[in-house]
């Protein structure tokens, strides 16, 4: 069992906030894309800031190299999601399915990465959480 310091609790709360932001900015992106809304550019810009926000929160605990790696994996998560949304909107089933497979493979990479940087973060649990997130987003 892991015991947490005050700093770790602050990180967990910050991560919770960032995940919430990730979810609603992703939803805004999907809605803006699907409905051809005029706010797609600022919504996309804000959504793509989210990986950097995560990296900034992780840096004091894990250093720049680890934070940058997470930022890259999470940016890929968003870019793949955009490919999936755009393929679905264009009714390109093969492209959508390829993006969907890539999205789940990226979730596997994120789960593995997070389990390697923190002994309290278990790969199977992260994978289940990320898959739930993807399924609810689809």
Task: Give the label of every model feature segment.
Residues 13-31, 71-85, 128-138:
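N-terminal extracytoplasmic segments of bacterial inner-membrane proteins
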Residues 107-138:
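An amphipathic alpha-helical core segment
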């Amino acid at each position: 069992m892991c015991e947490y310091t005050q700093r770790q609790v602050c990180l967990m709360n910050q991560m919770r906030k960032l995940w919430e932001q990730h979810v609603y900015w992703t939803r805004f992106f999907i809605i803006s894309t699907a409905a051809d809304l005029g706010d797609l550019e600022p919504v996309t810009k804000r959504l793509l800031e989210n990986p950097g926000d995560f990296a900034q929160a992780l840096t004091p605990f894990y250093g720049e190299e680890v934070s940058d790696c997470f930022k890259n994996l999470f940016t890929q998560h968003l870019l793949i999601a955009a490919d999936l949304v755009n393929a679905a909107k264009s009714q390109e089933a093969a492209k959508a399915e390829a993006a969907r497979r890539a999205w789940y493979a990226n979730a596997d990479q994120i789960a593995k990465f997070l389990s390697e940087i923190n002994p309290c973060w278990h790969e199977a649990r992260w994978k289940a959480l990320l898959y739930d997130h993807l399924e609810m987003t689809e």
